[in-house]
Amino acid sequence: MIINFPTKDHWRSASRLDYVIKGLDWFADNYNKLNIESVAFPPLGCGNGGLEWTTVGPITYRKLKDLPIEVEIYAPFSATRKEISVDFLENSVIKTSNVKGYKLGSYNKYWNLLLYSIQQLNNDRYSLHVGRTIYQKICYILTAVGIPTGFVFSKSEYGPFSPEAKNALLILANNNLINEETKGKMIEINVSESFVLDKNAFSSDDFEKVNKALDLFYRFKNTESAEIIASILFASSELKNSGSVNADKLMHYLQEWKPRWNNDECRNLLMEYSIELASMKWLSLSN
């Protein structure tokens, strides 16, 4: 038996949390009349509906956990381990009034170059494989070299961050183009085996930019080095908008942005990376 849960007014609209709650309440009141002995629930209203699992998950769990039937609740691929734990689902504080999902955007064909880059890195045994932190760095650098991803970046604790890039993960997942797999302590983002890049859809200039970015990605030793590289490039770009960039300005910007880097050891490390990036023509430092 399949039970339809309307979560929105129109298929193109964002989902409404109150519809999800009404549907769950209806199910709790009527499952016995339908002779249901076991049931599986998807993450209602998440995905294209735009509701957050951090709200939907706890509500679904609390509405269904005491029913005397077998219940399975599936989380979206983007949910973290913490967000699927019993402690989180039982105890997190949630807002339930006037909650409406955000509308996921449309698919950007240049994200195929992002998928291609992730695919290349994950298929290279010597490269750092792609998790959520590295994903943001890849998105930033591809955008920085001129790939029109549509992502806008700003400063965050671990380097440049884009809400649009995070949103793109949901769109890619909804199109069955990526999935996540737990490998040790890391959650790896994998490109679906069915994905094959149509190289005829892109120019030689596009591939030149992607290959330049890939050459840099292959140099990521760990998430820390990826953070340093992306942060230096972001800082250089921001400073360049207001004039020339020299080492002192760059160090001041980075250490003001991230106080944990405000020590001699980190400054020396940042300088090493900056000089190497300058030698690779990724940035230009004036005297």
Stretches found by the model and what they are:
Residues M1-W11:
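Short, basic/glycine-rich phosphate-binding loops at helix/coil junctions
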Residues N4, E72, L233:
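Residues in well-ordered beta-strands of folded domains
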Residues D9-K100, L104:
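Phosphate/ribose-phosphate-bearing ligand recognition and processing surfaces
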